[in-house]
Amino acid sequence: MLIHPQFDPIALHLGPLAIRWYGLMYLAAFIMFLWFGRLRTRQPHIAAQGWSGRDLDDMLFYGVLGVILGGRLGYVLFYKPDWYLAHPLDIFKVWEGGMAFHGGFLGVVLAMMLYARMRRRPWMQVTDFIAPMVPCGLAAGRLGNFINGELWGRVSSPDLPWAMLFPQAQGEDRAWLAAHAQQAVTSGVQAVFDQYHMLPRHPSQIYQFLGEGVLFFILLWLYARKPRPMGAVSGMFLVGYGVFRFAAEFAREPDNFLGLLALSLSMGQWLSLPMILAGVAMLAWAYRRAGRNGNDAQAGAHA
């Protein structure tokens, strides 16, 4: 049985400025984007498209805006619309937390559409370029969630070797016990609670760090190393992320203000399903288009 170490959310102080771990994770994500982006520009089929270091810097600027604005608005609209409708000024209190990946994803999509229009590049050429780097940001974000002791997993068997006790979850632990009294006794988690005053849970942040982050990055990077039809890498990202996220949600505790929705699926799972369907459609379109044209223009230079 493991106990969450309860890290100080403040990583360091620079005079009056407090630097939080979560902020450092965002910084790490942006640095990894630039690092792997430069590696990607050296791949022959990508170099033929004329990408430069300046392109990376500009995309990062637009991407940061998309992540922050989209992530915040997505959380407001998808998860707590009633609260923010009654307390509209709280929308601007980003330091209190509240970001949604699916909203950040839509924000980045819109930001890249604007970037592609300004640079006169095909939009899918832009999204194909950045897609393999996105899992780096996902990994950094999930690591930040773990350090903060938030977004913990569902109650697990006490026999699970890596089951973890989250002191921050004690309120939800008591609510779970009240709703599942008989199950708590038969599964053995009541005995754990009697001893530690906490319930064993899945460290779902680590699952997502390893799945959506590390493993997904490796698979998508390897797929994108070779020339693919335009739109295929983006489609593969949508399918891959949707599948990884959908699976991880079975171990992640649903938001307590939402719970499980229709078919006992979480909000994260319902939002992932359209991503999977859109990704499959994009892959089918990309390869069908490449078959008709004989040789897709993915590796060609932009106008």
Curated annotation (Swiss-Prot):
User: Is the Chaperone keyword given for this protein?
Assistant: no
Q: Where in the cell is it found?
A: Cell inner membrane
- Residues binding a 1,2-diacyl-sn-glycero-3-phospho-(1'-sn-glycerol): R142
Q: Please tell me whether the keyword Nucleotidyltransferase is annotated for this protein.
A: no
Name the enzyme group at the top EC level. transferase
**Record InterPro entries:** Lgt
As recorded in UniProt, its EC number(s) are 2.5.1.145
Q: What GO terms are given for molecular function?
A: phosphatidylglycerol-prolipoprotein diacylglyceryl transferase activity
GO annotations under biological process?
lipoprotein biosynthetic process
Give the domain of life.
Answer: Bacteria
Identify the PROSITE patterns for this entry. Answer: LGT (PS01311)
Q: Name one GO cellular component term.
A: plasma membrane
The membrane spanning regions, by residue number, are: 17-37, 59-79, 94-114, 129-149, 204-224, 230-250, 257-277
Q: Could you list this entry's UniProt keywords, alphabetically sorted.
A: Cell inner membrane, Cell membrane, Membrane, Transferase, Transmembrane, Transmembrane helix
Q: Name one Pfam family in it.
A: LGT
- PANTHER family named in the record: PHOSPHATIDYLGLYCEROL--PROLIPOPROTEIN DIACYLGLYCERYL TRANSFERASE, PROLIPOPROTEIN DIACYLGLYCERYL TRANSFERASE
Which protein family is it in?
Belongs to the Lgt family.
Q: What is this protein called?
A: Phosphatidylglycerol--prolipoprotein diacylglyceryl transferase
Task: Please name the source species.
Answer: Ralstonia nicotianae (strain ATCC BAA-1114 / GMI1000) (Ralstonia solanacearum)
